[in-house]
Amino acid sequence: MTVHGIAYVEFHCEDASKYAAQLRDDYGFVIGEPAIPVRPGLTRLTARQGRIVLVLTSAAALDDPVSDFVRRHGDGAAVLAVLCEDGADAARQAEEAVRKGATPVEGTTVAGFGDLALRFVGRDDPLLAGPEPDPAALLQEIDHLAVCVPAGTLAPAVRYSEDALGFRVIFSEYLEIGTQAMNSQVVQSPCGGVTLTLLEPDTSREPGQIDRFLDANAGAGVQHLAYRTDDVATAVRTLAGRGVSFLTTPGTYYDALPGRLGDTEIPARVLRELNLLVDQDHGGQLFQIFTRSTHPRNTFFQELIERRGAGTFGSANIKALYEAVERERADSA
């Protein structure tokens, strides 16, 4: 599969206009109404920032597939659209994926994971029509999507990614936190522009956040969307000023940083002030933070990430991010 990156992520929503207003007010997205025909009773909006394009769709009819999705999962990511050269190339790549084992859905859309579908689209797709990306935007692009899958389905999901979609595994981790545990594998397209973190609970251990997501979401789905920024400290300060709430990290994490990593490219005092996490791989450092979920089911949330050379994910950050979500659950219980 020779895609060029993520074209857009489509969310199915109870109220697309309300969802768009939150993205505009809290995250600074620019909202537009694409000039494409939609079936009666369907509302479709776009939210743009940098190279990020989110498509927000809601339906008035209760028997519409969009409404069915929302009933099952609440508002959530329903389609990951990957960018091909043009419409003809999108059709060719969808056909190739089906030949290699992908399940066809409709047009150039194939099955993905649970109710998250994968759609091949060309650069000429009407949903992508709009101004050139602003290189100075606070949030630049979608770094990755994290997808929770039921126990026992991670290995088949990875095989599907490799065989039908041509992705490769770039990172694997079995994470134990107290009495809980999860498996994770990160798969990436050959171009490096589409990255999925696949998460599976270990049901031989006590239930944790992946189990709770799967229960509340009624199955597999996108747990979070990570936005890459060139200045995560400024992004956190800016979004916090707009009302976005972030998860916190205990001071002991920062006390241990000098022994674990030595000097960090963002000073430790700034990391501590903003609750930013830091890790590194062979290429450099990365900085991450999760937002507090505002989803009625407490499922979907968002992430900010800045990469300073790091191309994968650090084990310490994965553990710290997991623990941050667990603390939030305990505090809100």
Name the predicted role of every residue range.
Residues 1-18, 77-82, 126-158, 218-225, ...:
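N-terminal beta-strand motif that seeds the catalytic metal site of vicinal oxygen chelate
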Residues 107-136:
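Internal, well-ordered alpha/beta segment that forms a basic, Gly-enriched binding/recognition surface
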Residues 1-53, 96-100, 109-112, 149-195, ...:
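Core segments of cupin and vicinal oxygen chelate
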Residues 57-59, 120-126, 200-202, 305-309:
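Short beta->alpha transition motifs characteristic of CBS
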Residues 6-13, 23, 29, 47, ...:
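Short, structured motif recognition centered on aromatic/hydrophobic residues
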Residues 13, 224-247, 253-333:
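C-terminal functional regions that serve as terminal interaction/effector modules
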Residues 31-43, 60-111, 134-137, 143, ...:
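A cross-kingdom feature marking solvent-exposed beta-strand/loop segments within repeated
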Residues 122, 146-151, 171, 200:
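Short, structured patches in soluble enzyme cores that scaffold and shape functional sites
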